[in-house]
Amino acid sequence: MSRVAALLAILLAASAAAAAALIILPAPSKSLAFVAIAAGEKSVFILALAVVGAVLALFASRPGTRLLAMLAVLLCLAATVVALVPFAQALRVASEQRVDLNFSRYLRSHIDTEGPIKAKKTVVFAELPQQGGTRSLGMDVYVPSGTLRPAPPAEPSRAIVVAHGGGWSAGDRGDASLASQWFADHGFTVFDVEYRTSPQPNWKGATGDVKCAIGWIKRHATTPDWNIDPGRITLLGRSAGGHLALLAAYAPNDARLPSSCPEGSGPDTSVESVVAYYAPTDLVWGYEHPVRKQVYDSSEKLRKFIGGTPETTGDLYRVLSPTERATAAAPRTLLIHGGRDQFVGRQHLDMLADKLHAVAVPYETLIIPYAQHGFDFVFGGLSGQIAEAVVLR
């Protein structure tokens, strides 16, 4: 019986140690990089697994199983120490940012997938001509519920326009529906927009679709259906969507990046502020310095998105780089990044922050040391809670 308990303890200890290793070591593959997101954001469960394994190992320690039990205890101790690191770092950042964390919500945190959200509506904002017919572009709209931050009914709400991630070639609106609903619960009207991810190269269409959505929202802002303040629109994007958000915000009236709406963008597509989660900002640098090619080949992603390399289409890489487009006229900017991002290096945040500082644009950065790329998709995780609170300010 003690031998079975010792083997079970080893199994639990090895599982905890393997999960903990993904917190501090580079992932060997893309699939394990996604597992690393959950490992870092749910590290308290690794801690629990390690504690159970250690207790079981001590219970099973007998002359014939002592070596196995000792090995299990050592693995559990190592996993415990590592599992505490992202938790402690999140507490430190929350304290620095004056964010009150909800630990009950943390224990209930889970992957943000689209579910039955009653407050959501879907509207078509563009009908684009394409071979064989037209292509409809839609946006999911989350209306303010007033659940957590009530506002007077007659007061126009602020709006958040969301551009999803997916390497410019995948993803869709609704990828972070719970986060969108959370912002709506806090008084925002949230528009989660669709943009074209194919065929590639699609740099012009994707950027133009985001601008088209902004123009549509501004045209309809004061209608009874929405009652939005058109001067208080925040553009928010994640990963590739963060790049598109920055580009649309920094070059609202650039003829090289026009709105894709058949009737034009209509109103000026400028926004009050822009928020970019773990976004590529210097595309030449990103092409030349992929973080981990076996996890995410940013060079190939950029080549397909733009239709060439920096050697063949260098001017276009610069036109599409937010670091090159930021001027004194750029809107207030919030840049958010995880320190352990294995898809988009944190250097992208640093380079854009330096440029914004140089041109005197109001900006803020939020770096969460042990957070991975896509950390906020663990809805309710500590890193996600910190980011939400900072965006809400």
Where in this protein do the model-derived segments appear?
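N-terminal cap/lid segment of alpha/beta-hydrolase-fold proteins
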Residues: 22-48, 93-153
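Catalytic histidine neighborhood in serine/cysteine hydrolases
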Residues: 357-374
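Mobile cap/lid helix-loop segments that gate and shape the active-site cleft of serine hydrolases
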Residues: 26-34, 112, 128, 285-325
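Primarily recognizes the serine-hydrolase "nucleophile elbow" in alpha/beta-hydrolase
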Residues: 212-289
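Short beta-strand element of the alpha/beta-hydrolase
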Residues: 152-166
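Short beta-strand/loop motif that positions the catalytic acidic residue
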Residues: 329, 335-337, 341
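Conserved alpha/beta-hydrolase "acid-adjacent" motif
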Residues: 342-351
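Catalytic nucleophile-loop/oxyanion-hole region of alpha/beta-hydrolase
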Residues: 42, 171-180, 191-232, 378-386
